[in-house]
């Protein structure tokens, strides 16, 4: 008889875990997925494209209903879990039902961070996190005067989508550059100019102190006294792990649900993966680590002695229509050397950081074709001494030895082939 396995959460981590588990242990488990949102699992990365009307709702769905049925997976979407009872091994639902489990996987993701400035409870204040948020913003965008708070990925994508939807948009960011965790000063400046060219006003070093209005948003007040008129405010200042169910069940929680290398929580037969999990003090909040955790846990529950050791991080994204990539120490610590290649004509920028004949960091803007290959070099620690002079021009121009890591991600990412610049700025600094 199949063991009852329950997954709380129906996002990208849960979907990947199901895919991996049914492939490796078909029939071993009777799988039930509990989802808070009233729809099947979807690709959250594409929400910005959905907001910008570049893809359809069908395009963001990860798997059709038939796929889940054919593999014997029961999906209870639109039925939030309200409690986990480890003593009797049951999950309670909002409708009063409860589901038994032999093994439980918590994949509850994260929640948007809410600001506490006065006026944040007014009508017209929105977040940008899930499918319902996209639907709300698409309805509100036409002709709106919108302010987006947050210059990270979510804020930029919200601003871009709102402009495409017909809104006049001002983006307000507390820090002195956009995407400060993923980009250096120069690439962030290039991004700001590209975002403004697409119709978004960008205000950096700007702190929001109050939302003006009586019943609904009328404006946003900044610390310097300026007031930006607005009837729509989107708060996109980050997310935090959704740990409520785990904490209430007595599972150890810090910032996220604490897991070991086996993705096991402090309670027997309860695991956690994705944005809600904290491994070795790290909460990732990114898709690829969630997928890696899902693969490891599926292997373990299929009887394989697999372990999760953490994830090397890289950013490879399309932000407001512009491709950006970063990995490793792209800012350059003391004792490192930076090689920079810039082409204002093609609006491309590449910075490689080298230490002890090893590539330790990279940031790319505009053309990210070689990003995954650089990431392989960073992770492997391969000596780049033999191709040092050609490395900045990309894999096509750097004839590495056969045993060096090769990038096999290009087809998956759909990157365009590299273009050569007519005029380049090439610099080395240390």
Where are these regions (language model features)?
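FAD-site-proximal beta/loop scaffold in flavoenzymes
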Residues: 121-142, 213-221, 226-299, 386-392
């Amino acid at each position: 008889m199949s063991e009852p396995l329950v997954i709380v959460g129906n996002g990208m981590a849960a979907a990947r875990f199901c895919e991996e588990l049914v492939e490796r242990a078909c029939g071993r488990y009777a799988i039930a997925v509990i989802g808070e949102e009233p729809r099947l699992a979807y690709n959250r990365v594409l929400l910005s494209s959905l907001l910008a009307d570049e893809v359809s709702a069908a395009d963001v769905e990860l798997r059709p209903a038939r796929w889940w049925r054919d593999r014997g997976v029961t999906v209870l979407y639109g039925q939030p879990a309200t409690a986990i009872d480890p003593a009797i091994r049951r999950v309670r639902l909002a409708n009063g039902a409860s589901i038994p489990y032999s093994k439980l996987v918590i994949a509850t993701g994260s929640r948007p961070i809410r600001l506490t400035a006065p006026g944040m409870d007014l009508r017209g204040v929105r977040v940008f996190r899930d499918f319902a948020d996209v639907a709300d913003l698409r309805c509100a965008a036409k002709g709106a005067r919108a302010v987006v708070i947050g210059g990270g990925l979510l804020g930029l994508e919200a601003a871009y989508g709102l402009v495409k939807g017909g809104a006049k948009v001002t983006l307000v960011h507390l820090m002195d550059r956009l995407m400060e965790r993923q980009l250096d000063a120069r690439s962030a400046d290039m991004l700001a100019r590209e975002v403004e060219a697409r119709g978004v006003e960008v205000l950096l070093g700007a702190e929001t102190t109050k939302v003006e209005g009586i019943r609904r948003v009328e404006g946003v007040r900044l610390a310097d006294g300026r007031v930006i008129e607005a009837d729509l405010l989107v708060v996109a200042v980050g997310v935090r792990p959704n740990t409520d169910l785990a904490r209430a069940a007595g599972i150890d929680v810090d910032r996220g649900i604490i897991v070991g290398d086996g993705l096991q929580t402090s309670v027997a037969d309860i695991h956690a993966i994705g944005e809600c999990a904290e491994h070795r003090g790290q909460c990732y909040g990114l898709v690829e680590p969630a997928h890696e955790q899902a693969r490891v846990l599926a292997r373990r529950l299929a009887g394989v002695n697999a372990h999760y050791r953490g994830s090397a991080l890289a950013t490879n994204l399309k932000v407001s229509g512009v491709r950006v990539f970063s990995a490793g120490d792209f800012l350059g610590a003391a004792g490192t050397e930076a090689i920079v290649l810039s082409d204002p004509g093609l609006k491309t920028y590449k910075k490689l950081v080298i230490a002890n004949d090893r590539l330790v960091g990279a940031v790319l803007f505009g053309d990210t074709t070689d990003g995954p290959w650089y990431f392989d070099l960073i992770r492997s620690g391969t000596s780049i001494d033999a191709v040092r002079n050609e490395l900045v021009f990309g894999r096509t121009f750097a004839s590495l030895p056969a045993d060096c890591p090769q990038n096999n991600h290009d087809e998956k990412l759909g990157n365009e082939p590299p273009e050569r610049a007519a005029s380049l700025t090439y610099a080395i600094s240390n």
